[in-house]
Amino acid sequence: MDTSILAVTTNPKGKNYALAVCWLLGVGCLLAWNSMLTIVDYYAYLFPWYHPSRILTIIYQSFSIGALSVLVHKEARLNTRRRNLFGYSLFSLGSLAVLVLNLATSGRGGIGSFIGVCVISAAFGLADAHVYGGMIGDLSMMTPEFLQSFLAGLAASGALTSGLRLVIKAAFKNSRDGLRKGATLFFAMSASFELVCVLLYAYVFPRIPVVKYYRAKAIIQGSRTVWADLAAGGIQVQPITQDEEALRYDHRLNKGDLMLLYSDLAVTLFLVYLLTFSIFPGFLSEDTGKYSLGDWYALVLIAVFNVSDLVGRYVPMVKKLKMKSRKCLLITSLGRLLLIPAFNITGIYGSQGWMIFLMSVLGLSNGYLTVCVITSAPYDLLAPEQNALGNLLVLYICGGMFAGVACDWLWLVGKDW
């Protein structure tokens, strides 16, 4: 065994530093898309006949699940460093493209502008497939705490964008020019932050001692995905031969084995995101009725969901509050389906207070169950198996999102559209 690997596996320092970087990388994974979702009132103003909240979401999810399916199939041989850097770079370039499009068209609507926004939404979906699966797979080979921090960062991006959107809306007022200025500021900040994430992942994260420690362990256990990241941290590793690879592979669980063993976790995540995305964001933007909050109403509901989602992802940090039974997690995810008639009835007969309450339940349960399921995946697997399982679970999350977005259109049945 390489002596440099032996050295690094005895020096796991910098855990808190790594947790902070994981959180920031989690924010970057969804910041660009959450920025697009959060300014949905601006797109509804520009493109009132195109159902932008629904169209953009289904385009995003279609490209995300399509690309992720290919990446999951090839995950064992992919260069994780190249995969994640490509994703964060595409997020940054996509955010910059929204900014340029907004400035070039001077905030005018029309089919040309809408097609441009749709193309950028597709690019965000492609970037998400690279980063989300890549990061979850990578962190699955480390520790549940890193996963929890990354997942909390995902939710924090939504909470941050929602809070900023409310401030911008109040500052720029509800005029076309004000909405446009707010959108411009949003994506300027998004493009900058995504560039920071590129730098963090490229030059900071691989040099943290505890990260090198876990990646060195992964190499010892036969992982081929982290060589470039370990090299970026200053540890050079000789590639294993094909004969060694075949010998190690014979003793591993393949993707089919993993899915049979952990199908309950995959189904739970699918159901969680099926329910969430059948309501969020399309139903919130178009089908919740009109109340005293006026055009602030959809933004407030989105903010409530995002903040509740963030809180839910920290609840499992209290060990007594973390649900560990896989059967209970599955039953709870099935129970959430009762929220569909609850939202429907409240949208017709209820007050805005009840709608806000239901939205907080939706967000809190979404965040809580996500962290409980992903961090409950076993850590006695070999590193390549953990990476494969992490990617598979993300695929089921994206599958649930896509199915939910498709079901979201059912809210329009019987309406004049």
Curated annotation (Swiss-Prot):
Primary location group: membrane
Membrane topology: Multi-pass membrane protein
Any single Gene Ontology cellular-component annotation: plasma membrane
Parts forming coiled coils: none
Membrane-crossing segments per the record: 20-40, 52-72, 85-105, 109-129, 144-164, 185-205, 265-285, 292-312, 328-348, 354-374, 393-413
Localization per record: Cell membrane
Keyword tags: Cell membrane, Membrane, Transmembrane, Transmembrane helix, Transport
InterPro entries cross-referenced by the UniProt entry: Eqnu_transpt, MFS_trans_sf
Tissue spec: Expressed in leaves and flowers.
Superkingdom classification of source: Eukaryota
Single Gene Ontology MF annotation: nucleoside transmembrane transporter activity
Family assignment from sequence similarity: Belongs to the SLC29A/ENT transporter (TC 2.A.57) family.
PANTHER family per the UniProt record, alphabetical: EQUILIBRATIVE NUCLEOSIDE TRANSPORTER (PTHR10332), EQUILIBRATIVE NUCLEOTIDE TRANSPORTER 2 (PTHR10332:SF30)
Function, as annotated: May be involved in nucleoside transport.
Protein's UniProt name: Equilibrative nucleotide transporter 2
Organism listed in the record: Arabidopsis thaliana
Taxonomic classification: Eukaryota, Viridiplantae, Streptophyta, Embryophyta, Tracheophyta
Protein encoded by which gene: ENT2
